[in-house]
Structure formats: structure tokens, C-alpha cells
Regions:
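C-terminal segment of N-terminal export signals and the immediately downstream linker at the start
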Residues: 21-38
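LRR flanking "cap" motifs
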Residues: 66-73
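Functional-site microenvironments in short loops/helix caps that host divalent-cation chemistry
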Residues: 39, 45-54, 58-65, 103-249
């Protein structure tokens, strides 16, 4: 079976496709013990206006069709929900693997992740793996709409931290002299928080969403450490994995649940 090429996130995969609120953090769930952030009920702006998509495509030398999945921008109303403050790390995933005798990622040393990667987002997990973890933790995967609201708040901002790209706010590959070295610890970019205080939602590892755009496929949000353009690191950017059983070095996940 053909697997999605890692660089597809950065280009044609997209075609296939707040006001600051001081909010309390949610209680940890009993199974994975990790903090979740409350995202309040209400409307938010999802996607990108057609005129803005055209401007961005010209500015970043992309074909406008690559942004087609984001257009038109629309106002969506969502009920309150909670979302993990950070992506699921190798450390957290190891607890699940050992508790459930679940198959670990292939690059691990048996059921133990490489020690230097403990606090990095878990990768080499497909969407079924992500859902299995979420079920164990008493959670679920977020929808693309929930993910986007948690990332951009209600003011329609371009990036989780604002409308201007900040090279120090996320893990990326934007013209750096050295080749990208992979993921980073999920706490490595404190300047990258969203209006709600959700972290690491741009770059590092792209994240599986619950939506099914087509049979066997899935939406990805957040860009990744391989991203070579700010265009793919925006809150509204939407990638698509043609196969939701892909296990790749740039795809991870975080969980959500009802408030």
C-alpha cells in the first residue's frame, strides 16, 4: 500500500483537502493524568476568506488551489470542550503501551521510547493508534473545527500567537542553514501558545483529527517540523493524509473530550 510521502504535507496535500480570555485549566483525566484546557462554547472563524487565500498564495508562491480546503471562511458555533494542553508525548504514549500491551512505534527499544525523545510528541502512530490511546485515556480525537478554535481563538488570527510569523514560536524548517533535526520537546517553544494557552499547535508534529474527508483518509492540522513555509503553519492550514494508517515521523496527535 502506498504511504503518504512526508513532503506531501508541505504542498499538494493541502489541496486535497480572540480576544484573550483568562480561562481555568481543566482537571486532569484519571488515565493519563495530563492537563486539559477548557475551550468555551461559542462562535469562531474557521478557514480563510477567498481574497485572503489568493493574497497568501501570491505571497508564498503557492497555487491558490492548495488552499481550497480552507475556503470559504465561515463562522461556526461549537459547544464547550476540553483539549490537551500539549500533544501526546512519547512518555505518555509509553504508559499506554505498557498498560494495554499495545504495539509500540517501530523505532522504540521494545516498549521504551528513546530517552532523549521522552518529552517529544509521539510520532510513527496512525489514526487508529491515536484513537486507541484516546479511548484508554477516556478521551477522543478533536475534530478539525475544535482543533482550529483551540489554536486561533475567536479573532481569526493567522497563527496561535498572532498574525505575524515568529520563527522562535514553533519547530519548523524555514530556510535554516542546518537541515531539520526532527521534533522538539513539546515545551520547547513557550512563545507559541494559543489565546487559550494551548501549546505546540504550529509545527513540530502534525496532528490527526477525527474528521473523515473520504474513505480511509483523515485531516491533519498544525504543520510539522518539515514545514518550509509559514503558509503551512497557520491555524487554518489543512493537510490531508490519503491513508489514515500512515505511521510517519512528522504526524502525532492530541486528545479532546466534552467539557
Amino acid at each position: 500500500m502506498k504511504l503518504l510521502n512526508r513532503r506531501e504535507w508541505l504542498g499538494t496535500s493541502i489541496a486535497a483537502s480572540v480576544t484573550w480570555l483568562a480561562l481555568p485549566l481543566g482537571a486532569a483525566t484519571p488515565d493519563d493524568g495530563e492537563t486539559m484546557v477548557l475551550i468555551p462554547a461559542g462562535p469562531f472563524l474557521m478557514g480563510t476568506a477567498a481574497s485572503e487565500a489568493e493574497r497568501l498564495a501570491r505571497e508564498h508562491h503557492y497555487h491558490v488551489s492548495w488552499l481550497g480546503g480552507e475556503v470559504p471562511q465561515r463562522t461556526l458555533e461549537l459547544p464547550a470542550f476540553r483539549i490537551d494542553k500539549y500533544p501526546v508525548t512519547n512518555r505518555r504514549y509509553a504508559a499506554f503501551v505498557n498498560a494495554m500491551a499495545y504495539k509500540p512505534p517501530a523505532h522504540w527499544n521494545g516498549t521504551e521510547p528513546p530517552a532523549p525523545l521522552l518529552e517529544h510528541p509521539v510520532t510513527f502512530v496512525n489514526r487508529a493508534d491515536a484513537r486507541a490511546y484516546a479511548k484508554w485515556a477516556g478521551k477522543r480525537l478533536p475534530t478539525a473545527a475544535e482543533w482550529e478554535k483551540a489554536a486561533r481563538g475567536t479573532d481569526g488570527r493567522m497563527f496561535p500567537w498572532g498574525n505575524e510569523f515568529d520563527r522562535e514560536a514553533c519547530q519548523h524548517d524555514l530556510g535554516d542553514v542546518k537541515p531539520p533535526t526532527g521534533t522538539a520537546p513539546v515545551t520547547a517553544h513557550p512563545r507559541g501558545g494559543s489565546p487559550y494557552g494551548v501549546m505546540d499547535m504550529s509545527g513540530n508534529a502534525a496532528e490527526w483529527c477525527a474528521d473523515n474527508p473520504g474513505p480511509g483518509s483523515a485531516f491533519l492540522k498544525g504543520g510539522c517540523w518539515l514545514s518550509e513555509s509559514p503558509l503551512t503553519l497557520r491555524c487554518a492550514a489543512r493537510g490531508m493524509s490519503g491513508f489514515d494508517n500512515n505511521q510517519l515521523d512528522y504526524i502525532g496527535f492530541r486528545c479532546a473530550r466534552e467539557a
